[in-house]
């Protein structure tokens, strides 16, 4: 696709814009030749040597949402090969302003925010090859905080996209084209400098969200993602971000932690191990429409899995155990007779069992909650398990799945 390579003159950019707009129309054509040609044009777009200029021009000149969607997709594909930090910085801020002030459908907005997050990660990681600079990632966190305070859906979207970028456990965890230690440094910066400021604002906004608010689904997804954060092992008090980079660069990567436990690093313990986290989730589960309570229960499972980094930094963790059990007892009742909520029963049962497992269970049994409440919780768990095993399995249309749930 040599026609997409030159982008230095206005007429070249105009020609590219026309080609891409036409390709977006023909990509769904019944004619195989037209579909193939359109696909070739869109697949060639990320290879343009002037990708940033082409993307800015197309997003500015075209009024078609489909064009914006495909152009941003091409940008996400090609961004790992762009190394000009000044150019990346300019387009990142431009994309943020455009996404915030330009009305777009949700599927286009999702690509905007992912592009902004990937750009921020790439700039932060690339800076380690010259002078480590955390500005891009910290600025992204500040933007998300500012937008969250106005209950803007962009704030939730930015925060959610940033959290999800660190949840994937595959080797190729990011499309930002970073080396492993550069990606870990980004995670360390988030843990040290972004989470302490962003997550309290996020939880406060979540608690203040009205029952009829349209932001509930994305907000619940965002909260669930951040409460599932897997803490990076770091020195207790890194004196600077540059020293933090040196530590990450020189420290061999640790094996992943067991999936059943989330060890909370000492600096984050006052935030993540606070009893109010459980209270906020319970409030949202009561107030929000379906399917938000499901996300809240999944977030509660994260909280049930929390463990202090060490016994010396347990802080308010015992009080959080008690608060979460109180919230569960208020929210969950005996299962009803429908056949479609086995997964929900399984999820709630997992929260109870993780909460009453090992050290967490010892805390509860040692007086964090009254003995009658603990006994009632055990009765509820047993009742649900027996209900699934001896009621749902025999009469359910999905007997295999129900049986697996009962055994689990």
Regions picked out by a protein language model, each given a short descriptive name:
Residues 63-67, 80-89, 100-113, 117-139, ...:
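Alpha-helix boundary/capping segments in eukaryotic regulatory proteins
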Residues 6-16, 27-31, 44, 64, ...:
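Amphipathic alpha-helical protein-protein interaction segments
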């Amino acid at each position: 696709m040599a026609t997409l390579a030159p982008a230095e003159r206005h007429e070249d950019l105009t020609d590219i814009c026309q080609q891409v707009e036409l390709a977006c129309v023909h990509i769904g054509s019944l004619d195989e030749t037209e579909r193939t040609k359109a696909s070739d044009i869109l697949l060639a777009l990320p290879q343009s040597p002037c990708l940033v200029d082409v993307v800015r021009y197309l997003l500015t000149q075209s009024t078609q949402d489909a064009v914006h969607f495909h152009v941003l997709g091409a940008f996400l594909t090609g961004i790992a090969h762009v190394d000009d930090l000044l150019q990346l910085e300019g387009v990142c801020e431009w994309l943020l302003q455009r996404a915030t002030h330009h009305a777009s459908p949700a599927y286009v907005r999702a690509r905007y925010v992912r592009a902004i997050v990937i750009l921020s990660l790439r700039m932060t990681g690339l800076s380690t090859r010259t002078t480590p600079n955390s500005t891009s990632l910290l600025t992204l966190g500040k933007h998300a905080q500012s937008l969250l305070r106005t209950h803007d859906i962009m704030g939730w979207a930015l925060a959610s996209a940033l959290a999800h970028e660190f949840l994937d456990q595959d080797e190729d965890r990011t499309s930002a084209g970073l080396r492993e230690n550069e990606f870990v440094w980004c995670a360390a910066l988030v843990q040290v400098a972004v989470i302490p400021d962003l997550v309290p604002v996020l939880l406060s906004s979540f608690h203040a969200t009205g029952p009829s608010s349209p932001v509930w689904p994305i907000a619940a997804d965002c909260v669930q993602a951040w409460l599932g954060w897997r803490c990076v092992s770091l020195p207790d008090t890194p004196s600077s971000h540059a020293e933090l980079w040196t530590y990450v660069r020189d420290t061999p990567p640790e094996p992943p932690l067991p999936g059943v436990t989330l060890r909370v690093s000492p600096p984050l313990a006052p935030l993540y191990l606070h009893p109010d986290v459980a209270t906020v989730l319970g409030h949202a589960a009561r107030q929000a429409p379906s399917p938000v309570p499901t996300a809240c229960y999944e977030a509660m499972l994260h909280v049930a899995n929390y463990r202090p980094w060490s016994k010396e930094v347990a802080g308010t963790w015992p009080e959080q155990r008690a608060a979460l059990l109180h919230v569960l007892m208020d929210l969950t009742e005996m299962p009803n007779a429908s056949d479609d909520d086995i997964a929900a029963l399984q999820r709630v049962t997992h929260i109870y069992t993780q909460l009453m497992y090992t050290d967490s269970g010892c805390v509860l049994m040692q007086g964090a909650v009254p003995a009658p409440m603990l006994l009632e919780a055990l009765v509820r768990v047993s009742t649900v398990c027996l209900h699934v095993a001896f009621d749902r399995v025999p009469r359910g249309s999905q007997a295999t799945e129900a049986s697996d749930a009962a055994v689990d």
